[in-house]
Swiss-Prot record:
Residues 63-82, 122-153 are annotated as: Disordered. Residues 1-21 form the signal peptide. Coiled coil: none annotated. One of its GO terms (biological process) is seed coat development. The keyword Signal applies. The keyword Protein transport does not apply. Residues 122-132 have a biased composition (Low complexity). Keywords: Signal. Residues 141-153 have a biased composition (Basic residues). It comes from the Eukaryota. This is UPF0540 protein At1g62220. It comes from Arabidopsis thaliana.
Length: 153
């Protein structure tokens, strides 16, 4: 490294040290805004209001029935399996955000098999149902008190 590069790097580091060493002064919200507002008003300034809800449900059913006549004699198999899954996620920001979510699912299966030496019969069926609901808001409730009374905007 030659002397010119060394001096340039030295000057840059001194400037960086001066910039980072400056005292940061705390400024109130009223000063930043250039107004004098009540404390209750400034608490809500810059607040993010949002409400989001996600919910899902799924159902799955598997039913199987077999009946057969083999050389060793008649045989019957019946199998059923039901699966349900529900999940939900709620995200709310802000003092007035409200979210509710609900999900439900059901799965029902039925399998039957019957065999005689001369005949075989099998039946399988399944039913599934899923439902999801999400409701949310980030607005203030309007109209406290009796209807028709209060301030008009």
């Amino acid at each position: 490294m030659n002397a010119t590069k060394f001096v340039v790097l030295l000057v840059i580091s001194v400037l960086c040290a001066i910039v980072t060493a400056r005292h940061v002064e705390e400024v109130s919200k009223e000063t930043k805004l250039g107004t004098s507002l009540p404390k209750s008003t400034t608490k809500g300034i810059g607040a993010q209001l949002s409400a989001a809800g996600i919910t899902s449900s799924s159902s799955d059913v598997y039913s199987s029935a077999t009946g057969f006549n083999n050389p060793k004699g008649p045989d019957a198999n019946a199998y059923e399996n039901g699966y349900t899954s529900t999940s939900g996620q709620v995200i709310a920001k802000g003092r007035k955000a409200r979210v509710s979510s609900a999900s439900a699912s059901t799965a029902k299966g039925d399998a039957k098999a019957a065999v005689t030496r001369k005949a075989a019969a099998a039946r399988a069926n399944g039913k599934v149902a899923s439902a999801s609901r999400v409701k949310g808001s980030s607005e203030k409730k309007k109209g406290k008190g009796k209807k028709g009374k209060g301030k008009k905007d």
